[in-house]
Design a protein with these regions (language model features):
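Active-site rim segments in enzyme catalytic domains, especially the processed small/beta chain
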Residues: 100-165
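Internal maturation/activation junctions in enzymes
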Residues: 11-108, 120-121, 128
Length: 167
């Protein structure tokens, strides 16, 4: 998803280095909408599904997606797969002055997770499984021996062995 976003954004010129420039934030948000649409439609366990990685990361595809974006308005609609209603989660990323970084997700997903608490431990059970795809024809369908893509996948970007950015 990050690479799809970066490929789309690579075709834009940004004035200066201000990370909070309104146009920059707008285009980053729109690129994210397109990349997450592609994630939900295509990204799956490549050992079990044909994931069109070369297409999704190609310059031609990025140019097609870039053509959908406008500086003066957001896309009215991003067509994509129909997913179950989503909820929120908590994500934490920290980088210290020494360059050490963490990328951490801890979630019960919906408010109070499943609403089920263990009698023995008092632990609240999560319901993150509601985000898995159960349609057997979908490339990311959950199944035996598969590693389906899920939203709880914190990442770390490195260059030349050095941490650049957690996400």
């Amino acid at each position: 998803v990050a690479l799809i976003m970066l490929n789309i954004l690579a075709g834009f010129e940004f004035d200066g280095d201000d990370p909070l420039d309104v146009r920059r934030l707008h285009l980053e948000s729109e690129a994210a909408r397109l990349a997450y649409r592609d994630r939900d439609a295509h990204i799956a366990d490549p050992a079990k599904s044909a994931v069109p990685t070369e297409t999704l990361l190609s310059e031609a595809y990025a140019a097609e997606q870039r053509a959908l974006l406008r500086d003066d308005r957001a896309m009215a609609n991003v067509p994509g797969p129909s997913l179950a209603p989503s909820s929120d989660t908590i994500y934490l990323t920290v980088v210290d002055t020494g360059g050490n970084a963490i990328s951490f997700i801890n979630s019960v997903f919906s408010l109070f997770g499943t609403g089920i608490v263990s009698d023995n431990t008092g632990v609240l059970f999560h319901n993150r499984g509601s985000s898995f795809v159960t349609d057997p024809d979908h490339p990311n369908a959950i199944g035996p021996g598969k590693r389906p893509m899920h939203t709880i996948m914190p990442g770390m970007l490195a260059k030349d062995g050095e941490i650049v950015m957690p996400f």
